[in-house]
Amino acid sequence: MSHIQPTLALTEDLIRRRSVTPEDKGCQDVLIERLTAAGFECETVISGPDHFRVTNLWAVKRGRAGTDGKLLVFAGHTDVVPTGPVEQWHSDPFEPTHRDGKLYARGAADMKTSIAGFVVASEEFVAKHPDHAGSIGFLITSDEEGPAHDGTVKVCDLLRARGERLDYCVVGEPTSVSTLGDMVKNGRRGSLSGKLTVNGVQGHIAYPHLAKNPIHMAAPALAELAAAKWDDGNAYFPPTTWQMSNIHGGTGATNIIPGHVTIDFNFRFSTASTPDGLKARVHSILDAHGLDYTLDWTLGGEPFLTERGELSEALASAIQAECGVTTELSTTGGTSDGRFIAKICPQVIEFGPPNASIHKIDEHVEVAFIEPLKNVYRRVLETLIA
């Protein structure tokens, strides 16, 4: 039996479970069985309304120092995005299939391989270091790809209420680009969305003097918002960006000036800006143009940043040893559950396989990356809590 098989076997077991958000489909039961056998105490946390029940897992194995020792947590999600048109896949998206050295399936890269890797890494670590000093934790949810209202954030709230102290967290998101380990995420930008409605007066398009066209009135303000410089970024983050995603106005008829226009927009912002500061600037610009408007805000997540420290150095060293790659710290990409964990954990780093195929038809992971991924995770455990 080759050394790669335990991680690969667990990955394939998880993949076969059709755990589209918010369904877990027994994935966490598999993890609980494995982790319990390795000495973990496991707790299931069910959350969400009846029509959107979310399954969460908190598992911990205390080291000899008990709660006084360092606690390293792996965070991940068992849920996957929908497959899209199944007929466009070259194989069943929920039947792990090997072609050309790759494992094809929904969740192969995002992120069932990472989960399997850290479980097997923990099993190997515990077997080799039965008297380990620090503690190991798992925070797993089935609501990361969806609204994320009843997943990781709920467990973080529970841990905060209990006074649980997390020292390090590795999030298994697929962060690599061209090869395993070439990039890890030591932070993420925040996301702030707005729904702006500018009011005018509806009328016949042939009589504009009897109407007020909200599209025309909004256009100069939107141009100013699009051209604005929000901040300069910093050493870790690029400058904040503002983008419109949708504009809708009118009834569909071509002879009516609309009574209002609605614009959806989004900020991706760095630690150089704050939500309140960005909101204030938007309102200032809109007010300066004399618009009659309403604006509803949704904060998708605050930015977070882990500066170079013990966790990033442990990961970089492990990646160099196992992959022969010098990793790059990056804050690019979308939001992740790291934004919730960063509120209760001072060092949060994301690391997983290449992400080029995630959420796509024929999602896959290189089979040759699976064992090194597990080994990197094990080395991090050995460095920080052995």
Swiss-Prot record:
UniProt-annotated catalytic positions: 79, 144
Give the pathway.
Amino-acid biosynthesis; L-lysine biosynthesis via DAP pathway; LL-2,6-diaminopimelate from (S)-tetrahydrodipicolinate (succinylase route): step 3/3
Task: Please give the catalytic activity noted in the UniProt record.
Answer: N-succinyl-(2S,6S)-2,6-diaminopimelate + H2O = (2S,6S)-2,6-diaminopimelate + succinate
Q: GO MF annotations for this entry?
A: acetylornithine deacetylase activity; cobalt ion binding; succinyl-diaminopimelate desuccinylase activity; zinc ion binding
Specify the domain of life of the species encoding this protein: Bacteria
**Residues that bind Zn(2+) 2:** 110, 145, 359
**Keyword terms:** Amino-acid biosynthesis, Cobalt, Diaminopimelate biosynthesis, Hydrolase, Lysine biosynthesis, Metal-binding, Zinc
How is the cofactor bound, as the UniProt entry phrases it? Answer: Binds 2 Zn(2+) or Co(2+) ions per subunit.
Which processes are annotated in GO (biological process)?
Answer: diaminopimelate biosynthetic process; L-arginine biosynthetic process; lysine biosynthetic process via diaminopimelate
Q: Does the keyword Amino-acid biosynthesis apply?
A: yes
What is the name of this protein? Succinyl-diaminopimelate desuccinylase
